[in-house]
Amino acid sequence: MLTQEDVLNALKTIIYPNFEKDIVSFGFVKNITLHDNQLGLLIEIPSSSEETSAILRENISKAMQEKGVKALNLDIKTPPKPQAPKPTTKNLAKNIKHVVMISSGKGGVGKSTTSVNLSIALANLNQKVGLLDADVYGPNIPRMMGLQNADVIMDPSGKKLIPLKAFGVSVMSMGLLYDEGQSLIWRGPMLMRAIEQMLSDIIWGDLDVLVVDMPPGTGDAQLTLAQAVPLSAGITVTTPQIVSLDDAKRSLDMFKKLHIPIAGIVENMGSFVCEHCKKESEIFGSNSMSGLLEAYNTQILAKLPLEPKVRLGGDKGEPIVISHPTSVSAKIFEKMAKDLSAFLDKVEREKLADNKDIQPTQTHAYSH
């Protein structure tokens, strides 16, 4: 007749998966009940792995059959499966009311020019505005804001930087932290850390809007910013040519995937009016954006002409909204700032800015 000792000896042959000790030595056998060749076993293991339980169930059942057990009630208790942590909103710049990402699928479309003039136009609406140059590989903001020769200022603790001021806008750029013309040869993690530091280690103070001039593309920098602060708006800058619109679509798709409210598209250099003959020429073509607008439920936030004064103002550090406030482009930037402000009010009212759903998550589980 089968005894509890026989059962226990048989269980000593059952090795716990991925270890060298048996389940009896581990103390996993909690109860044995034996009545008329009907066996009940209670096994408690520290793993929630279904594979581990299945291996033990198969090996124990086989060992008990060899002992002549006709009816086996095998209960293998496991700890509850670890729950994935609930995503939470991350915000490295809680004193900033709205963060606006100025993006483009490719370089050379006027993204920095848009960032500079939009920031000043917002400041002219009596808003507290910051301008962050996150294009660490090609920082043009210092020159465009007339700050290329300025020295950075540390706070009294010597641990944080104070933004520089130009045209009523608080400004910070990696271009202020290293010599002009010096290249940065950084891998992704260094870039990501730099962007986080420009949010957390800069004393921005209380801002209504922080405009962030991003590097071209849809990579580490964009994802890092989106995960670091809730973004209130994404704006993509493009020219009308087809290859630029193709890249603009990628930028809009990034906004959608990162849950960034899309404020609109800036069509830059759409046309050129000759100062002498007044003839208007569409240098980059006149391709329709209706498909993009419909696909991403957005609007054309501004249509800017190719105006030589814009380029000249950028080179001299005198943005056109300052140097020629009555020009066509300056008036467009002025209207753009008002339209963006209305959009940001809507985002705040409807609580659309949140980055909890794009935070990286990692579940730690005991799997043996």
UniProtKB/Swiss-Prot annotation:
One of its GO terms (biological process) is iron-sulfur cluster assembly. The keyword Transferase does not apply. It holds the Pfam family FeS_assembly_P. Keywords: ATP-binding, Hydrolase, Iron, Iron-sulfur, Metal-binding, Nucleotide-binding. The keyword Cytoplasm does not apply. Disulfide bonds: none annotated. PROSITE patterns: MRP. InterPro entries: FSCA_dom_sf, MIP18-like, Mrp-like_CS, Mrp/NBP35_ATP-bd, NUBPL-like, P-loop_NTPase, YlxH/NBP35. GO terms for molecular function: 4 iron, 4 sulfur cluster binding; ATP binding; ATP hydrolysis activity; ATP-dependent FeS chaperone activity; metal ion binding. ATP binds at G105, K106, G107, G108, V109, G110, K111, S112. Binds and transfers iron-sulfur (Fe-S) clusters to target apoproteins. Can hydrolyze ATP. Homodimer. PANTHER family: IRON-SULFUR PROTEIN NUBPL. In the N-terminal section; belongs to the MIP18 family. In the C-terminal section; belongs to the Mrp/NBP35 ATP-binding proteins family. This is Iron-sulfur cluster carrier protein.
